[in-house]
Amino acid sequence: MIALIAAVSAGGVAGTLLRFATANWVAAHWPRHFYAGTLAVNLVGCLLIGLLYGLFLHKPLAPIELRAGLIVGFLGGLTTFSSFSLDTVRLMESGQVPLALGYTSISVVGGLLATWAGLSLTRF
């Protein structure tokens, strides 16, 4: 159990640091598009969860520490629904309602498509 907790913790730290670095990079280079960092990590996370889920379906004997460390830890730390929600509210409050609606649509539909694409990549 200690190894499982350590794997999830290490994955969470790595995912969180990558999300933090992405958000800071976007803020420094595209300050008007603050939401782009959240969109990027969420779409990449969706692609990766589909890919990993598909790979682990074909390799059910992969250690639970690896599976949980990557899916629960790393991807849990990388992706964020709360930041997506805050970004959407900020866009709406600043009067950018069409952009907020587009961002929401791209996030949800794009996330579903990315997850499907990741899973599909394991079926070849």
UniProtKB/Swiss-Prot annotation:
Keywords: Cell inner membrane, Cell membrane, Ion channel, Ion transport, Membrane, Metal-binding, Sodium, Transmembrane, Transmembrane helix, Transport. Na(+) is not transported, but it plays an essential structural role and its presence is essential for fluoride channel function. One of its GO terms (molecular function) is metal ion binding. GO terms for cellular component: plasma membrane. It is a multi-pass membrane protein. HAMAP family: FluC (MF_00454). NCBIfam families: crcB, PRK14234.1. This is Fluoride-specific ion channel FluC. The gene is fluC.
